[in-house]
Amino acid sequence: MSVCTQCGMCTNSGGNTDRLPSLFDSIGPIMTGPSSSHTAGMVRIGRMCRQLIGGTPDTIDLYFYGALSMTYKGHASDSGVVAGLLGQLEDSPGIKMALQAARAQGIPVVVHRYPDDTSHSPATVDTELTRNGERYRIVGLTIGGGEIQMSEVDGFPVELYGSEDGVLFSASKAYAAAELSAAVGATFQSCVSTVNDGVYFHTAISDRSLSEDAMAKLKLLASKVYPLAGLWDFKLVNAEPLVNSFDELLARAKASSIPAVAEEFEAKRSGVTREWIRKKTLGAWKTMKASVVAGLGKNNLVAGFMPGDDGAKLMKLVNKGKNLSGPIVGTAVARAIGVMEANGSMCCVCASPTAGSCGVVPGCLLTSAEQLHSSEDQIIDALLVAAMTGVLIAKRAPVSGALGGCQSEIGVASAMAAAGLVQLAGGTPLQCCEAMALALKNILGLICDPVAGPVEIPCIKRNAIGVGNAYVAADMALADIRSVIPPDEVVDALINTQQLLPRELRGTLIGGLASTKTARQLKDVWYKRMEEMG
């Protein structure tokens, strides 16, 4: 197979075992909708830029490429970057008003669009910023589920994911970690440099952000300094994974359970305690439940074309006992649709693993937890199984529709939910993994073909099929029906399918439903609305 070079997706989905997601990259981030990649991810890129330039910028220029240059308004991507630059967090309700906030502070924001560009990843945001007379150019990418990678700072390549502490700086010579540590009075684990035209650009990583004294000493050595501090309350402290595969997960779970292995995995990865992990998981669960309530409240005003009350309509039918799929699946689907409508209305949701699929896991687990009268600890265990499932997939394959099709979002969410349902029902570790495999392979090939731009058509209703598929897979696994293709090989198949999927079917508004007459008409309406929104 020839590998396309247009967006980097083939490289990103090639089984990158160097990348080690957290459990809370799978059930997280907790965020304001509508897109984990193009809203929450953009906030995080904005936060990184703010940190690197040392505070709020004086001017902001944003560059969007390819499909994102036409969908960014529906995803609130421009608002997201600006919100981050102003110091807001991913779950801030002020994201939707960030452009107005910048204007009120006298900060000009200019968006540059390049829809025909194929030289950049469609998940790229390129920023040009000024602060206190200094100019900066910083480039970042969203890589799925709210995760980010900063790729360039002032023309120099970098590889930063948002959890690092330390500093970037330019100097007239190269510094090794030991030399730099002695010079500034801080301890650096690593210091690597690249050179261009006699300028040495350094990435110096420490276990904590630099003190004011160390920063002052560094400024005497450097021509330009970019502060670096981790963005969230956990970080990668050990890149050696506890388990690499579902086979290894099962082998380790024989002596305990998948939830216990998940806790051990995160404790090793992030240097946190079991109590911290369970408390943070409970926080994700509370957000999920709140998003269900918000979604069925019939007060949602989605950004684009949907009415915002389809979940409530289905719930009404279920409550009357008139739906065909029964009370459990019907309720779970109604809740999933409602959560997605809340997401489209820029309410707070928990990406699981993405915002575009954030209805599947809460719809399934809340409904079955009520059915089974599950305790809080049992629900946390089920979420840990779902999260561990997501980690082992995301470790090797992108969880982004723009990078791998909707199979990467709804497919992975359905697999996570199926595994969590089996855990909730008292299933074995093997049954949990089989449920994952059965669910994921049923949705292989699902394309990403959004209509016009907002995270609505077909995203909202595709969460419904993710729910139905999760229940079917969970029931089969609980009956000891096995996937002939083993779980890890099903992930291999996902990667293969992602690589073969053409860019026209990966969120570019070209193929699938986006090619229909109605979709083209809605696209024209949306683009006109975009022009009016500036």
PLM regions and their residue ranges:
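Helix-rich "cap/lid" substructures immediately adjacent to catalytic or cofactor-binding pockets
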Residues: 325, 329-345, 367-396
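Phosphate-handling active-site elements
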Residues: 50-61, 88-93, 368-383, 424-435
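A structural-propensity feature for long, helix-poor, extended segments
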Residues: 61-111, 384-420, 430, 442-469, ...
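Alpha-helix capping and helix-loop boundary segments enriched in small/acidic/polar residues
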Residues: 33-37, 323, 352-355, 377, ...
